Regions:
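C-terminal helical subdomain
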Residues: 186, 207-243
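Active-site helix of classical SDR
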Residues: 127, 162
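Substrate-binding pocket helix/loop in short-chain dehydrogenase/reductase
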Residues: 103-114
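Conserved glycine-rich cofactor-binding loop
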Residues: 19-21
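Residue(s) in the substrate-gating loop at a strand-loop-helix junction
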Residues: 146
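Conserved glycine-rich Rossmann-like NAD(P)H-binding loop of the short-chain dehydrogenase/reductase
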Residues: 33-50
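The beta1-alpha1 cofactor-binding region of Rossmann-like NAD(H)/NADP(H)-dependent oxidoreductases
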Residues: 44-45, 66-77, 109
C-alpha cells in the first residue's frame, strides 16, 4: 500500500473496484465531500492516476492498494495493512465485481470460480472484517449489486445469481443493524456503459442500446445520495425500477424468457 498523506480526519472511505466505472465516479464524490480515501483495484497505474487527479482537484488524501480480490488472501491482507497503518473506516464500498456471458454448459469454470470469489466471497469477507469498526463509528456500508439481483439470468446464470446473493445479504445486514445509526445500502443499477461490459463479453447486448441505459456519473450520484440518506435499496432510473417490479410480478416461467431476449445480441 502506498500513502500520500497520513490520515488525521475521522471520515475515511474504502472503495473496491475504484479504478474505473462506478467506483471511479464514487471516488470523485467522496473526495469532493472531504473524505480520505482508500482505493482498491487490480490496476496499479490506473489507481495512481486517479489518486493524482483526486489530489489535484479536491486536495484529497488518498491511499492506494493494488489488490486482485480474486485471490482469497486479498481481503485479510488489505485489512491488516490498514490496521498496521492505523486507518479506521467510516464507509466501505464493495463495488468490485465482474460478469461473463455464455451458456452455462459451455462457460469456463475457472472464470466462474473467480467471479464467485470477487462478487460474493471477497465482498462478504471485507464486510465481516470492516463492519465492526464501521458500526462503532456509526458509518455506512454500500454494496453494489445489479438489477440482475431480482431476476434469473439465462446466459449469465452465475453472474445473476451472485448479484442476488449481494442483494439478499445486504438487506439482511441492514435489518440486523436497523436499531443502530449505521446504514447499509445496496445499489442495483441497470445497464451502465463501463469496462464491465467488455470484460463480460456483452458490449453489443441489446441492454446497452435501449431506454434502460443510465450514464455512469448519474448512477454514482444516485448511489451516493441514497447511501447518505440511508436507503436500503437504490435502483437508478425510473424505467429500471418499473421493469424490475413488472418482472417480479410476472409468472416465474415467463421472467427467464424475457431476460433471455434482453441478452440477445444485436444483429
Amino acid at each position: 500500500m502506498s500513502a500520500t498523506n497520513p490520515f488525521f480526519a475521522p471520515k475515511t472511505a474504502l472503495i473496491t473496484g475504484a479504478s474505473s466505472g462506478i467506483g471511479l465516479e464514487l471516488a470523485h464524490l467522496f473526495a469532493r465531500d472531504g473524505y480520505r480515501l482508500v482505493l482498491v483495484a487490480r490496476n496499479r497505474g490506473a489507481l495512481r492516476e486517479l489518486a493524482t487527479e483526486l489530489q489535484s482537484r479536491y486536495n484529497a488524501e488518498v491511499w492506494i492498494s493494488p489488490k486482485d480480490l480474486a485471490h482469497p488472501a486479498s481481503p485479510l491482507e488489505l485489512y491488516q495493512e490498514l490496521q498496521e497503518s492505523g486507518v479506521v473506516l467510516d464507509v466501505l464500498v464493495n463495488n468490485a465485481g465482474f460478469g461473463g456471458e455464455g451458456p452455462f454448459l459451455n462457460t469456463d469454470w475457472s472464470a466462474e470460480a473467480e467471479m464467485l470469489q470477487v462478487n460474493i466471497v471477497a465482498l462478504t469477507h471485507l464486510t465481516k472484517l470492516f463492519l465492526p469498526q464501521i458500526r462503532a463509528r456509526e458509518g455506512k456500508l454500500l454494496n453494489v449489486a445489479s438489477t440482475a439481483a431480482f431476476l434469473p439470468g439465462p446466459f449469465m446464470a452465475v453472474y445473476y445469481a451472485s448479484k442476488a446473493y449481494v442483494l439478499h445479504f445486504t438487506e439482511a445486514i441492514a435489518e440486523e443493524l436497523s436499531g443502530s445509526k449505521t446504514t447499509v445500502t445496496c445499489l442495483c443499477p441497470g445497464p451502465v456503459k463501463t469496462n464491465f461490459q467488455k470484460r463480460a463479453g456483452i458490449a453489443d447486448s441489446n441492454l446497452l442500446h435501449g431506454p434502460l441505459l443510465v450514464e455512469v456519473q448519474e448512477v454514482a450520484r444516485i448511489a451516493y445520495d441514497g447511501m447518505k440518506k440511508g436507503k436500503r435499496v437504490v435502483i437508478p432510473g425510473w424505467k429500471n425500477r418499473a421493469v424490475v417490479e413488472s418482472l417480479r410480478l410476472s409468472p416465474r416461467r415467463v421472467t427467464p424468457k424475457v431476460v433471455r431476449r434482453l441478452h440477445e445480441k444485436k444483429q
